[in-house]
Amino acid sequence: MPRKSILSVNAGSSSVKITFYSYTKTPSVIATAQVSGITAPPATFKYSVGSKQKKEELKEKISSGPDAFKLLLHRCFTDSDLKDVASADDLAYICHRVVHGGDFESPVVINEETYHQLEDLEDLAPLHNFAALEIVRLCKKELPNVQSITFFDSSFHKSLPPYVKTYPIDQETARRNKLRKYGFHGISYSFILRSVAEYLNKPVEKTSLIALHIGSGASVCAIKDGKSIDTSMGLTPLAGLPGATRSGDIDPSLVFHYTNEAGKLSPASTKEMHISTAEEILNKKSGWKVLTGTTDFSQIAVEDPPSEQHKLAFDILVDRIVGYIGNYYVKLDGQVEGIVFAGGIGEKSALLRKAVIEQTRCLGFAVDPEKNQHGPGDDETVVDITASGRSDVKRVFICQTDEQFEMAYNCTKTQGLDKQ
């Protein structure tokens, strides 16, 4: 009997999300489940199946992504509400989001050889790839008969021109150590591009956008005729915009003035995962959390901020976003279908969108205040919030991005189901 579902896995630093999809030409959601709060216990478990929803604080100790994934599998395959729709026997494929794919330009089916190739990339992105690969390893052990496919955030940016992706350092060293701009959030940008092109009734290859994925990790991408021509993240996701705990772009020598132990291993390192003190400071002890004491941007993006530091954090993010929009607008020669806001903050923060668009009005962008405030409905993938009544205005969109769906959708394409 043919297998009939796809499992998409998205492992972050503090949460693991999984979604079961139908294995059909256009996948549809069967069930979703998530463990969050891994780094800030107690962890919580929640799921939804159709109209049924459940959320609970976990009594079990969950200290890692693999712990969370094991619990998710156990619950999904044993819970009375889930076991009838989330069966291991029905799984055709497991799709894994892996942040750094190095030189891989397309999804990779996991076998011994490809797994070890991905392990070699952990030195480039230990904070980002380690958890995902631990779950890939767990799937091979717990679900050995189900094929795992990895999808890379970096693959979307394979079209970056050499003058964009090359760092002006010794090129022999750069080639040997794979030191170049890669770019990330590519699975999200793929979804955004396809969804906005469909909304505009345009071919993807004729769609040009300035896309913003703004969440606890944030980036901007210039898309010309369906291809990434520049993006704010670089060798790792640390480059570019600040995030909840990331510094974003800084003077490269700053960290050596910050501490004289920058090159030493951080106490957060483990036997399997090596993190330098510099990496920990800039990835985990920076961003708007160190300015405000919170990673929750909804407490920062308010009309009456509780402190000057909250206002400063908001202004810093807006300033950096606006800088990239100006840069990319010029690179695209002004030929863009619009600016697209996506990601948890981009989709939810009307104040951020308002501030960014007000500061780019010289480029012709403007939003309708009511549409911007209302934002997208639950079932709306793309909404146009452009100011109405003006023919000269450039368009502004919100896209509710969905990386898990994008992996499932591309899984059906890579496995040829879309041609059946």
From Swiss-Prot:
Pathway info: Metabolic intermediate biosynthesis; acetyl-CoA biosynthesis; acetyl-CoA from acetate: step 1/2
Family indicated by similarity: Belongs to the acetokinase family.
SUPFAM superfamilies, per database record: Actin-like ATPase domain
Record: residues binding ATP: K17, H213, I214, G215, S216, G217
Residues reported to bind Mg(2+): N10, E403
Nucleotide-binding as UniProt keyword: yes
Keyword hit for Kinase: yes
Active site feature: D153
Name recorded for this polypeptide: Probable acetate kinase
GO biological process, alphabetically ordered: acetate metabolic process; acetyl-CoA biosynthetic process
Species of provenance: Emericella nidulans (strain FGSC A4 / ATCC 38163 / CBS 112.46 / NRRL 194 / M139)
